[in-house]
């Protein structure tokens, strides 16, 4: 086993994984038999609970871990619900549970879920869809590789964008990565 720590960004890990909500047999996301997920250690590109488990894992061995919400996508925050005027969604055929994307004041893309709507208002949920969920991962570390200074610098600019990004654009919480059924390619 190699010795890694979250503060030392010098290597990238390559993993295969599948994730389920604890107690469910439904796979939420998986890259098994697909391209490996690669992330820079310590760059906040995947959820912290999975990153910690990867650092302790044996290369080539399947591991299983249960990750609490606090080390995954955070606890569900009722304060992340917002009622907005329906006219802000003009031209959009709304459905309960649909994902919508917007921009924050600092031009960051943010994902939200339509919880409910009426003729005059829409209830928008800015929690990550997996907030409050305990996740069960099965994963295998395929290997580690050294990263260049350019990759380290780029990871600071990319962190927080997209599914595997640090904050993932999901309410500004720590976390990101694996489990939200996004494309990782």
Swiss-Prot record:
Subcellular localization(s) per the UniProt record = Cytoplasm
The segments labelled IF-chaperone in the record are 81-125
Biased-composition ranges, Gly residues, are 164-178
Name the positions where Ni(2+) binds: 163-164, 178
Q: What are the entry keywords?
A: Chaperone, Cytoplasm, Isomerase, Metal-binding, Nickel, Rotamase
Q: Does the keyword Isomerase apply?
A: yes
Q: Name one GO molecular function term.
A: peptidyl-prolyl cis-trans isomerase activity
Q: What PROSITE patterns does its record include?
A: FKBP_PPIASE
Instruction: State the Gene Ontology BP annotations.
Output: protein refolding
Query: Which Pfam families would you find in this protein's record?
Result: FKBP_C
Entry keyword annotation includes tRNA processing: no
Query: Which residue numbers delimit the PPIase FKBP-type domain?
Result: 1-99
Similarity comment: family membership: Belongs to the FKBP-type PPIase family.
Description of its domains: The N-terminal region consists of two globular folded domains that contain prolyl isomerase and chaperone activities. The C-terminal region binds nickel ions.
Q: Its function? A: Folding helper with both chaperone and peptidyl-prolyl cis-trans isomerase (PPIase) activities. Chaperone activity prevents aggregation of unfolded or partially folded proteins and promotes their correct folding. PPIases catalyze the cis-trans isomerization of Xaa-Pro bonds of peptides, which accelerates slow steps of protein folding and thus shortens the lifetime of intermediates. Both strategies lower the concentration of intermediates and increase the productivity and yield of the folding reaction. Also involved in hydrogenase metallocenter assembly, probably by participating in the nickel insertion step. This function in hydrogenase biosynthesis requires chaperone activity and the presence of the metal-binding domain, but not PPIase activity.
Q: What is this protein called?
A: FKBP-type peptidyl-prolyl cis-trans isomerase SlyD
């Amino acid at each position: 086993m190699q010795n890694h720590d979250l503060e030392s960004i010098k290597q990238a890990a390559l993993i295969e994984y599948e994730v389920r909500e604890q107690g469910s047999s439904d796979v939420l996301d998986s890259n098994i038999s697909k391209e490996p997920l690669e992330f820079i250690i310590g760059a906040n590109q995947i959820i912290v609970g999975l990153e910690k488990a990867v650092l302790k894992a044996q290369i080539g061995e399947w591991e299983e871990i249960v990750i609490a919400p606090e080390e995954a996508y955070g606890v569900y925050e009722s304060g992340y619900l917002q009622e907005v005027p329906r006219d802000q969604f003009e031209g959009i055929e709304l459905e309960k549970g649909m994902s919508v994307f917007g921009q924050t004041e600092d031009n960051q893309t943010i994902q939200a879920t339509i919880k409910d709507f009426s003729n005059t208002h829409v209830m928008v949920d800015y929690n990550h869809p997996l907030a409050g969920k305990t996740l069960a991962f099965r994963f295998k570390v395929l290997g580690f590789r050294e990263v260049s200074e350019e990759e380290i610098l780029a990871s600071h600019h990319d962190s927080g964008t997209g599914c595997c990004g640090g904050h993932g654009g999901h309410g500004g919480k720590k976390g990101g990565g694996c489990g939200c059924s996004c494309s990782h390619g």
